[in-house]
Amino acid sequence: MRPSRRQPDEMRAISFERGVSKHAEGSCLVRFGDTHVLCTASLEEKVPAWLRNSGKGWVTAEYGMLPRSTGERMRREAASGKQGGRTLEIQRLVGRSLRSVIDLEALGEMQITVDCDVLQADGGTRTAAITGGFVALHDCLSWMQARQMVTVERVLKDHVAAISCGIYDGTPVLDLDYAEDSAAETDANFVMTGKGGIVEIQGTAEGAPFTEEEFHELLRLARKGIFRLVELQKMAVS
């Protein structure tokens, strides 16, 4: 039995609250159960120096956790003068995931930065950041389309979402919360498109190695969860 009493293939309650920032071109507060992430998408009408005069745009991401997003207060990374390795890894993952469904040439020489700030953490913050970050990115593109800067259908090739899976107490399960993640024998994150294309898989055996059969079961669970997340994204942005 999972600590949350969910079925192995049951996700937490998922919600998207759009338009939570009056300043950002796109914004979304995404909730995966008790994990809450604020995602804002900001437009800059310029690109990094290495993309100037290329005709291509850029989508990037930044990620951070508020000091009291966890059970005990975390020191702000700004106070230590540098970002931690985990932070850098996650924000690069979010950026790669969002770029996988963007036509950078159709975007033109503009940059969109998606900021993902964890307000409350209970496992799966990176997957929530990707899934909610897409909604914020979509709304930013819609804002641009309303001003005749882009056409959303040309820039946006597909949806993208992410979910965690793992083996808990010998059973493959979907969408781990912190209690499950901290005790899981295997922990994995899957990023996939709405059409089922695989963008990235991160998997680690925390205890004994997992088998190929167990991996395929985790992939099956992830695909089911991501297709549901994409349905919820489409409902949110419609």
Curated annotation (Swiss-Prot):
Pfam families: RNase_PH, RNase_PH_C. Keywords: Nucleotidyltransferase, RNA-binding, rRNA processing, Transferase, tRNA processing, tRNA-binding. GO terms for molecular function: 3'-5'-RNA exonuclease activity; tRNA binding; tRNA nucleotidyltransferase activity. Its EC number is 2.7.7.56. It catalyses: tRNA(n+1) + phosphate = tRNA(n) + a ribonucleoside 5'-diphosphate. SUPFAM superfamilies: Ribonuclease PH domain 2-like (SSF55666), Ribosomal protein S5 domain 2-like (SSF54211). It is an enzyme of class 2 (transferase). Phosphate binds at R86, G124, T125, R126. GO terms for biological process: rRNA catabolic process; rRNA processing; tRNA processing. The keyword Nucleotidyltransferase applies. Homohexameric ring arranged as a trimer of dimers. Belongs to the RNase PH family. Phosphorolytic 3'-5' exoribonuclease that plays an important role in tRNA 3'-end maturation. Removes nucleotide residues following the 3'-CCA terminus of tRNAs; can also add nucleotides to the ends of RNA molecules by using nucleoside diphosphates as substrates, but this may not be physiologically important. Probably plays a role in initiation of 16S rRNA degradation (leading to ribosome degradation) during starvation. This is Ribonuclease PH.
